[in-house]
């Protein structure tokens, strides 16, 4: 057994427990060089101790290698379990975050749908009210214009009727005066032709002849006046027929205009419904895309994603229907 670590003193064996000093040096070693048992005994003990030390060292190294291998295996298993648990924890956290995200999106979607429905209902109510008011204004304006035209046509017909009556009366008076003048001239000529003597003797006959001529002239004047009245009545009837035909045409035009207005209003309602539907779909698409951008790129600052989803353009001024241009001519 080795007493110290410097290998200077050795023990022979466990029985004698004799301490063997180290080998001599120099002359002493040469002097005892021939003494084989001492030399053999000394190196045998040292070799045994060296072999034991080597065996012990190898055993310790083997144990250390085994321990190191077990430690490496245990460490690998621990790291594998840690990675697996970390992966499971990350997957669980992602699933929980995804579930929360879906719930939040569903809540936002329901709120947005509710807001859109309220805004759509309000907009439709206002639009229908505006359309109703606009149609009432257009109908009132059309009725006023039609009444004004009818009144103007009736005034023109009345004026033409009065002018025709005045003209017929003037012509009757002129014809009657011409007839009376002609009869007077004819009577004067007859009187002149009968001679002066006949005038003196036959005053009564001349007076009677004058009365007869005047009666005949009054009859002719009555006949002419009656004919003129019949002609005037025919002219008035013709004017009345023309007036009725014009009035009927105007009423037909008014009915056609009202039908066109109703058709235009119906088409306007259909186009407005399509516009509302497309506007709602466009708003939903833009909001969904904006949410996708916000959730996909949460670190983007405001304005960095405008090239992906630019702002909507304003309605051109030439497409805006002003209220003062909606009335029909």
Swiss-Prot record:
<keyword id="KW-0175">Coiled coil</keyword>
<feature type="coiled-coil region">
    <location>
        <begin position="225"/>
        <end position="251"/>
    </location>
</feature>
<dbReference type="InterPro" id="IPR038927">
    <property type="entry name" value="C6orf163"/>
</dbReference>
<protein>
    <recommendedName>
        <fullName>Uncharacterized protein C6orf163</fullName>
    </recommendedName>
</protein>
<feature type="coiled-coil region">
    <location>
        <begin position="57"/>
        <end position="120"/>
    </location>
</feature>
């Amino acid at each position: 057994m080795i007493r110290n670590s410097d290998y200077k003193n050795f023990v022979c064996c466990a029985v004698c427990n004799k301490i063997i000093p180290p080998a001599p040096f120099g002359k002493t070693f040469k002097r005892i060089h021939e003494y084989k048992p001492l030399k053999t005994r000394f190196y045998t003990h040292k070799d045994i101790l060296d072999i034991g030390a080597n065996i012990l060292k190898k055993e310790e190294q083997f144990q250390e290698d085994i321990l190191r291998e077990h430690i490496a295996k245990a460490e690998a298993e621990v790291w594998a379990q840690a990675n697996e648990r970390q992966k499971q924890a990350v997957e669980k956290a992602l699933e929980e975050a995804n579930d929360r995200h879906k719930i939040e999106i569903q809540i936002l979607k329901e709120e947005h749908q509710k807001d859109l429905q309220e805004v759509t209902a309000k907009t439709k109510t206002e639009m229908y009210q505006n359309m109703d008011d606009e149609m009432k204004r257009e109908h009132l304006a059309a009725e006023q214009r039609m009444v004004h035209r009818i009144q103007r046509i009736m005034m023109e017909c009345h004026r033409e009727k009065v002018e025709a009556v005045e003209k017929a009366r003037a012509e009757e008076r002129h014809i009657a005066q011409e007839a009376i003048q002609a009869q007077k001239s004819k009577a004067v000529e007859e009187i002149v032709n009968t001679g002066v003597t006949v005038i003196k003797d036959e005053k009564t006959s001349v007076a009677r002849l004058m009365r007869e001529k005047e009666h005949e002239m009054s009859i002719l004047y009555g006949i002419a006046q009656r004919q003129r009245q019949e002609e005037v009545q025919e002219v008035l009837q013709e004017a009345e027929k023309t007036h009725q035909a014009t009035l009927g045409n105007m009423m037909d035009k008014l009915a056609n205009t009202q039908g066109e207005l109703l058709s235009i209003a119906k088409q306007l309602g259909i186009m407005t419904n399509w516009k509302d539907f497309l506007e709602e779909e466009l708003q939903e698409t833009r909001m969904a895309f904006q949410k996708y951008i916000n959730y996909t790129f949460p670190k983007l600052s405001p304005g960095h994603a405008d090239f992906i989803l630019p702002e909507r353009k304003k309605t051109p001024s030439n497409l805006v229907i002003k209220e003062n241009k909606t009335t029909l001519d």
